[in-house]
Curated annotation (Swiss-Prot):
Gene3D superfamilies: 5' to 3' exonuclease, C-terminal subdomain, GIY-YIG endonuclease, UvrC, RNAse H endonuclease domain. This is UvrABC system protein C. GO terms for biological process: DNA damage response; nucleotide-excision repair; SOS response. The keyword Disulfide bond does not apply. Interacts with UvrB in an incision complex. Residues 207-242 form the UVR domain. Pfam families: HHH_5, UVR, UvrC_RNaseH, UvrC_RNaseH_dom. Belongs to the UvrC family. GO terms for cellular component: cytoplasm; excinuclease repair complex. Residues 15-98 form the GIY-YIG domain.
Length: 590
């Protein structure tokens, strides 16, 4: 690549955090022999890659000259980019990356596989069979959190040698950092429960550690032990912010972290679809790629794309042990094939696995979006360039468990932090439901109760009737935020505005960005509806050993009853609180 080619390629890239790779391909132009020459991270990928158009060193100039293309993977935060860069450099060992001699990796937290009393510790080299969480970028925060876990749940941190030879409790027990399982001061069952509670924190359940710390802090303040209360307050601040930096979102990081895992995201635009695949090994994200295929026509296009991709892609490749999807693929034959191959398929509804799926979706949407879609949309609608687009959709089953979704895209990419959802009154009236949902958004904006900026475009999932209902709600609330309120009908793929209907071609870039927003609003609404529906009454109800808390944990892990049904007995056992007998019972009943 020369300087002009690099700058031209940079203009096509997102101005977002992420990782970029300079790659060289075979002389025939295929990617079969693709070699990664250099891996870098950036807060703004577009700006960083543009700088390579005028390299300042001979070494980098030589790298650019050997490169044929630049590929990227977007992330939500700079921390994610930092960790992904480290993983990719380790994976590919690019020629032009400077390697540190000691090659230290980022710290992880491991809970060992010791049968009676697992140990928790910070490590860079987890033991085989251990549950590993991370990696994390701030070792100080990790050590603070592990100390908090030990003080709350009494997990041991000693070596196996010291544990075996201990006859009486050590100093950690006296300091309140260990429950002394070595001397039987705590029963094996109670210790196991403590391990499960601690594990839930590292799986993303912040309250599992924050809540007991908060109670300890309140008790210390009540007893006027103000120095201890202050120390607990500082520790609580680290715990509450531990999962917010996004550092661990590039890791599989659950009890099955050692399994090879593929995470798929889908974006459909016109007659084509993009599938982004993220691959994790040993709990760390080490590979990502994108694939284009023809999008089937019909109602559930994303599900159809997933089913087609699973068959086409894995027919010629080794299957991973686990596959995470944004929604069920809905194909019984594909499900039977994967089940026979002992592949666990899940649709995560919450936690770190759900964030991995969101990251795959973000990469799929970014790959799908080509050219200046927002500029084309502005020209087509006669409005200013819409930097912020919000989409709304309603999901229900014959008027029951009615829910609304409100998603947000900024500069053409999903802004998941600004997603909202709303449980609506039960009524089997699509127009009335849309009026309530948009009214809720509009009234909160007018009253100042919604801290999000107003959208430039508000997109309604539906046709003329849904649009009129949305416009009624906007007018009734006196909301003048959006420059345009429009609708996108599913079947006809036509854009409806107050004045006219647009029937753009399937290759129109302005249609593609609206389709991505519409499809994401639909997915988010359906996911919430599924959660509520399963919460009201599920096939899990009445199963011996499955109470409300365990039911919620199962649904959170697998996304839905369908996800639980597809899980193997081994996958079920990996959920905290599910033993061998309960797992067998669940599998048999479902």
């Amino acid at each position: 690549m020369n300087g002009d080619e690099v700058r031209a390629r940079a203009s096509e890239l997102p101005a977002e955090p992420g990782v970029y790779q300079f790659v060289a391909r075979d002389p025939d132009g295929t990617a079969d022999g693709e070699r990664v020459l250099y891996v870098g991270k950036a807060v703004d990928i577009r700006d960083r890659v543009r700088s390579y158009g005028d390299p300042r060193s001979e070494r980098i100039a030589g790298m650019v000259a050997r490169a044929d293309d630049v590929t990227v993977a977007v992330t939500d935060t700079e921390t994610q980019a930092l960790l992904l860069e480290a993983n990719l450099v380790k994976r590919h060992q690019p020629r032009y990356n400077v390697r540190l001699k000691d090659d230290k990796s980022y710290p992880l937290v491991q809970v060992t596989s010791h049968r009676e009393a697992p140990r928790i510790e910070v490590t860079r080299d987890p033991d085989p069979g251990a549950a590993a969480f991370g990696p994390y970028t701030d070792k100080g925060d990790v050590e603070t959190v592990v100390k908090a876990v030990r003080s709350v749940y009494g997990l041991r941190g000693c070596s196996e040698h010291k544990y075996r030879d201990r006859e009486r409790p050590c100093l950690d027990y006296e300091m309140g950092l260990c429950a002394a399982p070595c001397t039987g001061a705590i029963s094996e069952r109670e210790y196991r429960e403590a391990v499960e509670s601690a594990t839930r924190f590292f799986e993303g359940e912040t309250g599992a550690l924050a809540d007991p710390l908060r109670r300890e802090m309140a008790a210390a303040a009540q007893a006027e032990a103000f120095e201890r209360a202050a120390n607990l307050r500082d520790r609580l601040a680290v715990v509450e912010g531990f999962h917010e930096g996004g550092g661990a979102a590039v890791a599989a990081g659950d009890a099955d972290a050692g399994a090879s895992t593929d995470v798929l995201g889908v974006a459909v635009e016109g007659d084509a679809a993009t599938v982004a695949r993220l691959h994790a090994e040993g709990g760390q994200l080490v590979e990502r790629d994108q694939h284009r295929l023809e999008a089937p026509q019909g109602e559930d296009r994303v599900a159809a794309v997933l089913a087609a991709f699973l068959v086409q892609y894995y027919a010629e490749r080794d299957l991973p042990e686990r596959i995470l999807l944004p929604e069920p693929h809905g194909d019984d034959e594909v499900a039977a094939w994967l089940d026979a191959a002992d592949v666990a398929v899940g649709v995560p509804g919450a936690g770190r696995e759900a964030r991995l799926v969101e990251l795959a979706l973000k990469n799929a949407h970014r790959r799908a979006g080509g050219g200046d879609e927002l500029g084309a949309l502005a020209d087509a609608l006669g409005v200013r360039r819409p930097e912020r687009i919000e989409g709304v959709d309603v999901s229900h089953a014959q008027g029951r468990e009615v829910v609304g979704s409100n998603v947000c895209f900024v500069d053409g990419s999903a802004e998941t932090a600004d997603y909202r959802r709303k449980k609506l009154d039960e009524e089997n009236d699509d127009y009335a439901n849309m009026r309530r949902l948009v009214g809720w958004r509009a009234e909160r904006a007018v009253d100042g109760r919604d801290d999000r900026p107003d959208p430039d475009v508000l997109l309604v999932d539906g046709g003329r009737g849904q649009l009129d209902a949305a416009l009624d709600a906007v007018e009734a609330a006196g909301w003048d935020g959006p420059d345009a309120v429009i609708a996108l009908a599913k079947d006809e793929e036509v854009v409806v505005t107050p004045d006219r209907t647009y029937d753009w071609g399937s290759d129109a870039p302005q249609l593609h960005v609206l389709q991505r927003v519409r499809d994401e609003a639909h997915r988010f609404a359906v996911a919430y509806h599924r959660t509520l529906r399963d919460d009201v009454t599920t096939a899990l109800d009445g199963i011996t050993g499955v109470g409300p808390e365990l039911r919620a944990r199962l649904l959170g892990r697998f996304g839905s009853v369908a996800g639980v049904r597809q899980a193997s007995v081994k996958d079920l056992r990996d959920v905290a609180g599910v033993g061998e007998a309960t797992a067998e019972t669940i599998a048999k009943r479902l």
